[in-house]
Amino acid sequence: MIPEGTRFLLPPEARLKAEVVGKLQHLFRRHGYEPVELPALELYDPDHPLAERAFKLVDKTGEVLALRSEFTTLLAKLLRAHLGEGAHRFQYAGPLWLREADAELGRLREYTQVGLELLGATGPLADAEVLELAFAALEALGVQGEVEVGLPSLVGEVLKASGLPEALQRRAQQAIHRKNLPELKGLLAESPVPEEARKVLLALPDLYGGREVLKEARGLPLPPKAQEALAQLERTLDLLGRPVLLDLGMARRYEYYSGIFFRAYTPGFGLPLLGGGRYDGALFPKAAGFALGVERLLEALRLPKEEEPPEVLALDLKALRRFARERRTELFHGEDPVAYARRRGIPFLARGEELFRVEEA
């Protein structure tokens, strides 16, 4: 009936999905993030990071198009010529499509993201703002979450200073990210590495925990740029004033993320609910942001099994118009409204301008 990897949502889940998206949009708007609307179709770019997994189409002129596979790159292309100096705040929401999606709640090929971008601002205060909104997003949804913060740029600076050939650097980065110490030791044995760099590289996978991890990292012979990145992270966390889980061996896309990278998890659910970070220079001179996966959030929220009943059962259109402005109201179609209301737990009936309790009917 529908393609594999897509979903048909009935009212309980569709309603909750709309509420989740609406709460996030309202939260971001309150913090100055204005909405933008992006086209679902874009010109196909073979250099796009998700080009191989995008749905491609050909129009009647022969031009190759692609369904939107992520928001940040497209937003950067469209905004680059329109922004002046200073900080700019944007939010987005909508569906994305991937032809070969990663295994996630099955294999979704159509999924929804809500996210934000802070452009034109950098430094600890800007990073703290984005992190604070990640916490606030989870709180707005009533999701108990733990935010994990990494510093891929630190790993990148250590690898650059190691003198390893580029191919070995990439393999070492993957081993550090996976915390595979035996593999990392084997890679370092393939090429001469200064003892100080070797010591730092072997320590990175174990730099995981609370703020005490920063003290451990400061005790290592880090190259100057890595020391600077660590100091920036410490200042960011001081400004944030919230507990986070630090993973200084997190090396995901270190060539893309120029500063922090973070993601959030909730107990009993193994996939990250959100992810983001700072990517100065990748698409904008100064940029940071994050996105939340709505389908993952819905799963983590453990959907209610039963649909929430309306507050009012309207017996005519006049009552529907009158009370739907203030309460959740449903128009009745049938022969016995009292029995129907009692069965569904609807507390009020309405006729015209009159509202009365079911037990009084």
Swiss-Prot record:
It is found in: Cytoplasm. This is ATP phosphoribosyltransferase regulatory subunit. Pathway: Amino-acid biosynthesis; L-histidine biosynthesis; L-histidine from 5-phospho-alpha-D-ribose 1-diphosphate: step 1/9. It comes from the Bacteria. Keywords: Amino-acid biosynthesis, Cytoplasm, Histidine biosynthesis. It comes from Thermus thermophilus (strain ATCC 27634 / DSM 579 / HB8). Required for the first step of histidine biosynthesis. May allow the feedback regulation of ATP phosphoribosyltransferase activity by histidine. This function is generally fulfilled by the C-terminal part of HisG, which is missing in some bacteria such as this one. Heteromultimer composed of HisG and HisZ subunits. GO terms for cellular component: cytoplasm. One of its GO terms (molecular function) is histidine-tRNA ligase activity. One of its GO terms (biological process) is histidyl-tRNA aminoacylation. It holds the Pfam family tRNA-synt_His. InterPro entries: aa-tRNA-synth_II (IPR006195), aa-tRNA-synth_II/BPL/LPL (IPR045864), HisRS-like_core (IPR041715), HisRS/HisZ (IPR004516), HisZ (IPR004517). Belongs to the class-II aminoacyl-tRNA synthetase family. HisZ subfamily. NCBIfam families: PRK12292.3-3. The keyword Protein transport does not apply.
